[in-house]
Amino acid sequence: MATWSNFNLQNSASPLMEQIIFFHDHTLIILIMITILVGYLMISLFFNSYINRFLLEGQMIELIWTILPTITLIFIALPSLRLLYLLDELNNPLITLKSIGHQWYWSYEYSDFQNIQFDSYMIPINEMKNNNFRLLDVDNRIILPMNNQIRILVTATDVIHSWTIPSLGVKVDANPGRLNQTNFFINRPGIFYGQCSEICGANHSFMPIVIESISIKNFINWINNYS
């Protein structure tokens, strides 16, 4: 989750989020180089006294300012396209989780198992314990096994919501009457927080999402105990 005084992205908990962070850093380096170059040129123009009153055209400079931006865009577009294809790729998921957005809570169904479904509400401030996070903790967490491919189906019953876990690099719109899907792979145990990322009404800020990542053995025990 996000921490105090942290200006970076959240620590990744999935290979997909790692790739998103790499792309962010790659793009940021290019933007910094462009900013420095443009700043240097502007300062040079302000403080030098050179002038060319007879310059009518400059084909070479026009060629340069056409080719350089094109090359820059290619360097940004190629890794971006690769990442977009990775986002849509489904690799034989072990578990399918269905997430349904409501005003203003989430409900979940484990489609591969019988009778495992529950609602997930934010814990009110007056019921919080000392180790809870304000506006982030819920009464029923999503339990998922780590090091396994997970598919999630997202929909809504009333208005548009958005199911988002930043540390996993996952953000899916929940549209009424439509199923959207994506997949993710959690590569470490832990508790990961997210929130609804689409303004959905008065209590939009009170729709947190919590995933608890555990080993496959503990996940099987949880399934057996829940059933």
UniProtKB/Swiss-Prot annotation:
It comes from Choristoneura occidentalis biennis. Cu cation A1 binds at H161, C196, C200, M207. It catalyses: 4 Fe(II)-[cytochrome c] + O2 + 8 H(+)(in) = 4 Fe(III)-[cytochrome c] + 2 H2O + 4 H(+)(out). Its main location: mitochondrion. Component of the cytochrome c oxidase, the last enzyme in the mitochondrial electron transport chain which drives oxidative phosphorylation. The respiratory chain contains 3 multisubunit complexes succinate dehydrogenase (complex II, CII), ubiquinol-cytochrome c oxidoreductase (cytochrome b-c1 complex, complex III, CIII) and cytochrome c oxidase (complex IV, CIV), that cooperate to transfer electrons derived from NADH and succinate to molecular oxygen, creating an electrochemical gradient over the inner membrane that drives transmembrane transport and the ATP synthase. Belongs to the cytochrome c oxidase subunit 2 family. Pfam families: COX2 (PF00116), COX2_TM (PF02790). Cu cation A2 binds at C196, E198, C200, H204. Residues 52-62 are mitochondrial matrix. Component of the cytochrome c oxidase (complex IV, CIV), a multisubunit enzyme composed of a catalytic core of 3 subunits and several supernumerary subunits. The complex exists as a monomer or a dimer and forms supercomplexes (SCs) in the inner mitochondrial membrane with ubiquinol-cytochrome c oxidoreductase (cytochrome b-c1 complex, complex III, CIII). The lineage of its organism: Eukaryota, Metazoa, Ecdysozoa, Arthropoda, Hexapoda. It is found in: Mitochondrion inner membrane. This is Cytochrome c oxidase subunit 2. The chain crosses the membrane at residues 27-51, 63-81. Residues 1-26, 82-227 are mitochondrial intermembrane. Mg(2+) binds at E198. InterPro entries: CcO_II, CcO_II-like_C, CcO_II_C, Copper_CuA, Cupredoxin, Cyt_c_oxidase_su2_TM_dom, Cyt_c_oxidase_su2_TM_sf. One of its GO terms (cellular component) is mitochondrial inner membrane. Its cofactor is Cu cation.
